[in-house]
């Protein structure tokens, strides 16, 4: 039986707002994948949001896979520990205690058929799908990513009217909400204040949340979807 698992790592709003990602930067640190079924990953679809509503000029990026179960009969090793951090997101790898947690990797290569992203037909995001993989999965699964060039998630969608915690309405300005956001997006402002989950986008200046706004965010604060990169993993029993 074939299974599909959606993976939604978080890249905090303040990290996205700070600067574009550069070659060899950590895109996101270890994210535990819940609900994965199967003993190996056979295929991966990657969905990458654009820069302020416009699709990215895509670059290569590398996915790393790991497990907390470090077990080797040869050396008599049996340790259960989640993979330690790679380092600071939006900077290079700087810590290295994850070495024995690794189980595999995959490189999305913009120059290779079957590994590269679409050419911008979707306007606001880029997508790539690859298959024929056999990345082993241990007792659990973690995923992290390193970019091989510039990826930019910076936004100029700004709070137009100070948000209020007694309403689901969010008014924005400067850049269109229809281009940048969609139902299901989780919004934070540039200082990582939680705004809420988008229920609908009425027009370029009006967003409706699933629940009342979680925080009071000031006028002119930039808003971010904290899940600009998502993956769908395919596997078989």
What are these regions (language model features)?
Residues 1-33, 183-191, 197-198, 208-211, ...:
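Viral structural modules
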Residues 85-133:
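Extended, solvent-exposed segments with strong compositional bias
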Residues 27-67, 181-186:
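Beta-rich globular "head" domains
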Residues 49-105:
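Surface-exposed turn/loop modules enriched in turn-prone residues
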Residues 27-38, 129-135, 174-177:
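Extracellular and analogous surface-interaction loops
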Residues 154-222:
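Autoprocessing Asn-cyclization modules and mimics
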Residues 46-52, 59, 67-74, 144-153, ...:
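Short, flexible beta-strand-to-coil junctions
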Residues 1-18, 132-157, 224-237:
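C-terminal interaction-tip segments
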């Amino acid at each position: 039986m074939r299974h599909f698992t959606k993976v939604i790592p978080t890249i905090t709003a303040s990290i996205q707002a700070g600067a574009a990602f550069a070659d060899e930067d950590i895109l996101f640190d270890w994210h535990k994948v819940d609900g994965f079924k199967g003993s190996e990953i056979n295929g991966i679809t990657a969905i990458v949001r654009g820069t302020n509503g416009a699709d990215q000029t895509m670059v290569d990026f590398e996915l790393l896979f790991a497990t907390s179960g470090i077990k080797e009969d040869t050396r008599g090793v049996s340790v259960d520990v989640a993979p330690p951090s790679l380092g600071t997101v939006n900077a290079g790898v700087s810590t290295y205690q994850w070495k024995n947690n690794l189980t595999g990797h995959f490189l999305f290569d913009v120059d290779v058929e079957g590994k590269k992203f679409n050419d911008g037909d979707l306007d606001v995001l880029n997508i790539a799908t690859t298959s024929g993989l056999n990345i082993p999965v241990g007792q659990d699964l973690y995923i992290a990513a390193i970019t091989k060039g510039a990826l930019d998630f910076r936004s100029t969608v700004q709070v137009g009217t100070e948000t209020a915690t007694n309403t689901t309405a969010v008014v924005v300005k400067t850049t269109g909400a229809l281009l940048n956001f969609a139902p299901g997006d989780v919004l934070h402002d540039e200082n990582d204040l939680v705004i809420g989950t988008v229920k609908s986008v009425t027009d370029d200046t009006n967003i409706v949340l699933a629940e009342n706004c979680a925080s009071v965010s000031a006028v002119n604060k930039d808003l971010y979807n904290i899940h600009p990169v998502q993956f769908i993993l395919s596997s078989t029993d």
